[in-house]
Amino acid sequence: MREIVHIQAGQCGNQIGAKFWEVISDEHGIDPTGTYHGDSDLQLERINVYYNEASGGKYVPRAILVDLEPGTMDSVRAGPFGTLFRPDNFIFGQSGAGNNWAKGHYTEGAELVDNVLDVVRKESESCDCLQGFQLTHSLGGGTGSGMGTLLISKIREEYPDRIMTTFSVVPSPKVSDTVVEPYNATLSVHQLVENTDETFCIDNEALYDICFRTLKLTTPTYGDLNHLVSATMSGVTTCLRFPGQLNADLRKLAVNMVPFPRLHFFMPGFAPLTSRGSQGYRALTVPELTQQMFDAKNMMAACDPRHGRYLTVAAIFRGRMSMKEVDEQMLNVQNKNNAYFVEWIPNNVKTAVCDIPPRGLKMSATFIGNSTAIQELFKRISEQFTAMFRRKAFLHWYTGEGMDEMEFTEAESNMNDLVSEYQQYQEATVEDEDFEEEGDYERE
């Protein structure tokens, strides 16, 4: 089987990671003790992608939990599925990273990283044929961002030919823990551009807006935001966990989704949007799902796809429905909105259907878009970064851990380059002979 090793780092990474395991364990019929109580062979057919089978027929997540302080991991251990995880796979320090990227990447995190790599090695060795790694983390803090990106580069060194996927939570002033989030996020993106194959950008701004506007929650909690994240992660990984033809492993997903190696930041979406506890009471139709799925309000990244163009798209429909209708609706969307899909990648929308719907829904749709509009998210962080960096505000916390200002400047320009690359391909047409001479024409 093609196995995936899952790593969760930092407070946010551990919280969304724990939710992810709750949701997929439920979908595969695995209870908190690791015992299977399912009702369909489909649940077990590809169970080995995420679970090891232990003695006594128990299923154990192939998950590694990392943090620089014990708090969050204690709550995961005490949570509903806390006993499911392998006890040796909890690796934590005591000092904390204090929301400081440099502590996670260069000092505190660097001391713990070898312990983590030992467990990564052990998990990888027990795999039959490892396809790659997935990391859940946030970019705004210290551990998930700093140590998370350190882990990525170390794993990359040791497993250069395996796929590296991240679910990265991007900070937003609307749901902010710390004033230095733009620094931490920019330093992280600088790493992700170079060292990951696929990054799902989960944007706290978008999650907050969905909870507030669509779900009418006046004061969304992290629990509400994480409910959306776990639904999205479950949808995105459906093709990896259940039998099917399309995007059935991380590499095939990357091949379909990433036309240029640096442009691998995806905008996820989900339909129908439901709040925790109140699953939708009316069944949706395929046209409604399709329409909702492409709607800007359903995107988990606060970017408007109408401000850019799609390079590639993958859609995953779940539930019992007519394949013919799904294909018709997807073609319909593309024909009606063909201006929003680059014309120099024909057939750039791929669709998969899985029979097993998520709990509480008859059918759902998950959207993965590689849109040039994601540049809006990087621009937002870049502006916040520049505002502080030009005054050198808070820099002493980073230089005190041995960082150089130069590294900040490099990270800033790498992210700005990324924005211009997205812009360049947004404006490119089939006729353009050479992409190099951009800048001659402004956007209409």
Swiss-Prot record:
Annotated signal peptide: none
The domain of life for this entry's organism is Eukaryota
Listed A to Z, the keywords are:
Cytoplasm, Cytoskeleton, GTP-binding, Magnesium, Metal-binding, Microtubule, Nucleotide-binding
Matching SMART domains: Tubulin (SM00864), Tubulin_C (SM00865)
Q: What is its main location?
A: cytoplasm
Per the record, the GO terms for biological process are: microtubule-based process
Residues given in the record as GTP binding sites: Q11, E69, S138, G142, T143, G144, N204, N226
- Residues annotated as binding Mg(2+) are E69
Checking InterPro entries in the record gives: Beta-tubulin_BS, Beta_tubulin, Tub_FtsZ_C, Tubulin, Tubulin/FtsZ-like_C, Tubulin/FtsZ_2-layer-sand-dom, Tubulin/FtsZ_GTPase_sf, Tubulin_C
Q: What does this protein do?
A: Tubulin is the major constituent of microtubules, a cylinder consisting of laterally associated linear protofilaments composed of alpha- and beta-tubulin heterodimers. Microtubules grow by the addition of GTP-tubulin dimers to the microtubule end, where a stabilizing cap forms. Below the cap, tubulin dimers are in GDP-bound state, owing to GTPase activity of alpha-tubulin.
Q: What is the protein's name according to its record?
A: Tubulin beta chain
- Biological source species: Trichuris trichiura (Whipworm)
